[in-house]
Amino acid sequence: MSENSSPKLESTSAAAASTKKPFPEWIKPKGKETELLINNSLTGGKVPFVFNESGKGRSLTWYACGPTVYDASHMGHARTYISFDIIRRIMKNYLGFNIQYVMNITDIDDKIIIRANENGISHSDLSKKWETAFFEDMKLLNVLPPDALTRVTEYVPQIVEYVEKIISNGFAYESNGSVYFDTVAFSKAHDYGKLEPNSVGNEKLAAEGEGSLTATSAVSEKRSGFDFALWKKSKPGEPVWNSPWGEGRPGWHIECSAMASDLLGGNIDIHSGGSDLKFPHHDNELAQSEAFYGNRQWINYFVHSGHLLIDGLKMSKSLKNFITIKQALEKYTSRQMRMFFILHKYDKAMNYSPESMGYAIEMEKTFVEFFHTAKQILRDSPLSLPQFWTQAEKDLNKHLQNANDQVHQFILDNFNTSDALKTLSDLVNKTNVYIRSCAEQKTNPRLNLISAIAEYITYIFSVFGLTESSTASSMIGFGSAGKGNIEEEMTPILNALTQFRSEVRASAIAKDTTSILKTCDNLRDEVLPLLGVKIDDKSATTAMWKFEDKETLKKEIEQKKEIEKKKQADKEEKEKKLKEKFEKSKIPPQQLFINETDKYSKFNELGMPTHDKEGVEITKSQLKKLQKEYDNQTKEHNNYLKSLSTSTSSPTLTSTQSPQ
């Protein structure tokens, strides 16, 4: 470190690490204050959301840190992008904001260069491949695309201009073809490390932020060890762009500052990203942008998603718990994964495990069954039935109104979807109690009340993105994706019905009732689920049909087949062991050890081993074990002989024997 280093940037010592530094002053935006509270990483707590409505109505700007595309997207990405997709939908579809949502793609970086060289392909081919895969994953997860997408490789001229301006403002310098941000000069006029003040001076984090191709070689070029690269001089084999400082490439942190500023300007309402990016990436973004604009606050609200643990551990390939989004979707549906994230607060650490996913799946089933029940009531009960409200209906309606108020307050409290969803679950439980009570008293549930509850829950689910497509206000339930014309929708169902009719007719003509039943079961278990229809047998002669998500039903079929496959394998293994045991019972005890010459060399008159293969006498402890095995064989062989004497065709089986 040079002698110009500021005390604010000295290496973090044990004493300094133990003292929590305060957050710098946050400037409350001018404008209309709302009831919405947001956990702002710039303050370390919840603050009211304020937006400037002059001339633009309820509009806001939002910049989201996108992925560095060098590998498959994993569950950590799902955690971040689903969480912020939910918040974006809430702010747009529930709170009524018009959002300009910009996300970047880092398509040139140290990690990309290293991976491309390892694979022997160009960095552009590698990044294009994984960018395509990323957006395929986002589509499968029902994550809305950004309004504008910024790729680093398409913004290099703007990045160069941005760096030039920072240099001219006195906060960056050129050194050996690279350009570095002057943290010492900046710290004299601004607050550096707004998001994580305690991480300022952490050499390890600072080095990680520079990238593995740069961190070590650049130390001697910097005025301070904590300065970071805005422009990197390219080494042989690295991509290059022209600049006033020679051929090179952008640094990691400057990319977001330049691209976000180009589209959203010098003051942005919301910036989002994962917690692991706070320092140095996001703190460096803030510093660069303030240095460029000469202002004190580039971002008004910085929001971060919490860490995702896998079975309580940090996800890594070395621990063999690295789970890609596609791998997760092989086991769970997109809706189940979103339900899982909704059940957790977006800004807190969470644990991904079979148990936690199991809870989300059970929660989903609760709502699925409720929607089926509500639809059946509305479908089968005419409005001509009594609709007078008794105290039971008044009480249930009160629960609906309370749930509406509570969900609203939870949403305003830092997007608390977890408690909002539990409130809806409680409303469903109360509604189910009411429906059962009606059945017991032989009265009909009041249709408009059931419809109002189901439609309200559906509306909140559409806000959270749990419905795969826009669900009309008159619709209830999760809905389904891809609503085409009637012919497109009915064709696969009519094909299945036609095939079913042909098979039943053929079996009926052949008077094969067993085949007819098998065809009916196949329709229920194999054909209709793939069309999004589930049939539940209520009795030997009646059944109830339900519309359900195709992927959910498909996975249920797969899970059922896996269970049956395991049962069959266990059965075969058990039969195999019984058969082996039975075959062994045919051997007289005197011959049990005789052929084991690889273990023993001498035997007594009963066939018991007396010496091992080396000619050493068997020890007493070994002899005791062999005697026990010998006695057991005597018992099994006697049972075998007894079975021969009582049967002339095949041995009578005992609990210790098996058929041949």
UniProtKB/Swiss-Prot annotation:
One of the GO BP terms on file: cysteinyl-tRNA aminoacylation
Entry keyword set: Aminoacyl-tRNA synthetase, ATP-binding, Cytoplasm, Ligase, Metal-binding, Nucleotide-binding, Protein biosynthesis, Zinc
EC number: 6.1.1.16
Motif ('HIGH' region): 67-77
Catalyzed chemical reaction(s): tRNA(Cys) + L-cysteine + ATP = L-cysteinyl-tRNA(Cys) + AMP + diphosphate
Known cofactor(s): Zn(2+)
Free-text cofactor note: Binds 1 zinc ion per subunit.
Tree of life domain: Eukaryota
Molecular-function GO terms, alphabetical: ATP binding; cysteine-tRNA ligase activity; metal ion binding; tRNA binding
Entry similarity comment: Belongs to the class-I aminoacyl-tRNA synthetase family.
PANTHER family per the UniProt record, alphabetical: CYSTEINE--TRNA LIGASE, CYTOPLASMIC (PTHR10890:SF3), CYSTEINYL-TRNA SYNTHETASE (PTHR10890)
Protein name, per record: Cysteine--tRNA ligase, cytoplasmic
Source organism per UniProt: Dictyostelium discoideum (Social amoeba)
Gene this chain is encoded by: cysS
